[in-house]
């Protein structure tokens, strides 16, 4: 279970399904002997949400916009019902590009050298 929380612009929190946390962020918290390793205010390299019937609309209409405002580098929405992945990637000009994947191999920018077979994400 993911208990990491990402602080939003209004001071509340979201708990993504999966998040890649930079090593430097974890090390900084350890150096400060912080007891709170699960709250991050800075932009994350990769945030993943899994679409569900109960929260799918909220994930796309609200959380996606907040992740983009934070400047998260790559945001994925896995849609298990139609077996697709929508990826938003932050570009140098500050805008996000959107790509929809239905098959093949995905290479997350946040994890150089990692290749993920899309079909494997939807195996039971």
Question: Model-found features: residue ranges?
Answer:
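C-terminal interaction segment
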Residues: 2-70, 77-124
């Amino acid at each position: 279970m993911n208990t990491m929380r990402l602080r939003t612009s209004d001071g509340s929190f979201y708990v993504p399904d999966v998040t890649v946390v930079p090593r430097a962020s974890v090390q900084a918290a350890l150096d400060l002997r912080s007891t709170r390793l699960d709250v991050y205010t800075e932009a994350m390299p990769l945030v993943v949400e899994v679409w569900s019937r109960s929260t799918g609309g909220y994930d796309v209409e609200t959380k996606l916009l907040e992740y983009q405002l934070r400047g998260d580098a790559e945001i994925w929405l896995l849609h298990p019902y139609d077996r697709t992945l929508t990826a938003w990637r932050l570009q140098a000009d500050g805008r996000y590009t959107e790509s929809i994947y239905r098959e093949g191999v995905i290479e997350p920018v946040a994890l150089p050298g990692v290749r993920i077979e899309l079909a494997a994400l939807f195996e039971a």
